[in-house]
Amino acid sequence: MKSQPSKFHACRPKLALLALFILSGCATLKQCAYEGLSRDEWQKPDRVIQSLQIRPGNYVADLGAGGGYFTFRLAAAVGSAGKVYAVDIDPDMTQLLERQAKQKGAGNVDVILAKPDDPLLPASGVDLILTVNTYHHISSRVSYFANVRKYLRPNGRIAVIDFDRRAWIEGLFRHYTPREFIIREMENAGYSFQREFDFLDRQSFLIFAPLKVAAGARLPPGALQRREDGSPTRAPHRSYEMS
């Protein structure tokens, strides 16, 4: 009579894989956790980059860069005359980003270990700030993005991509922000909603620009928005709480 394989033996391949991750370094394990195994299928990174209309020579911040999923795609888009600031508050991830930039020869990528309340971008500013799957992690988002305005150059933009209620796993663990919350918070931080792209199945993809108002003036609610097809709409205004 053949003995049945133990549960331990059945699990050995998984344990070996876990051990490999551990031996390869904590940052690599985090990177795999952030990016998943099939992210390209649902994140559509090439279409995201194309939608942002980045020009050679642009300066771009990848806010919450993580393992560099978008960082080096952005670096290719801005070219040698441009610059990408890979911003993260996790030292493990910034060290990983620095190693990757060196290995890839990406001289147009600067890595920034930021503070939780300030991305610490250069005073010279950027043309675009892209934040992907990071918005829901930021505390005091209105004050955070109000502070970030100083880093945007004239005609600068912020692109926010975050999980929404359609993402089942992320919704279960509240790793998401409803679209209407993002719009309301960004308006309160001093931005107008410029455009929306709807080709991402799990995420909202929203573009904002700073409102131009006189010093000391109160920012008006309900700034004009435009969807991907160019049709105007207005953000919903409602009372809410978000943990």
Regions found by a protein language model. Give the residues of each.
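Conserved SAM-binding motif I beta-strand of class I
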Residues: K83-D88
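Conserved class I S-adenosyl-L-methionine
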Residues: G57-G66, A159-R184
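A short glycine-rich, Lys/Arg-flanked "PGG" loop and its adjoining helix->strand segment in the class I
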Residues: A75-G79, V142-R157
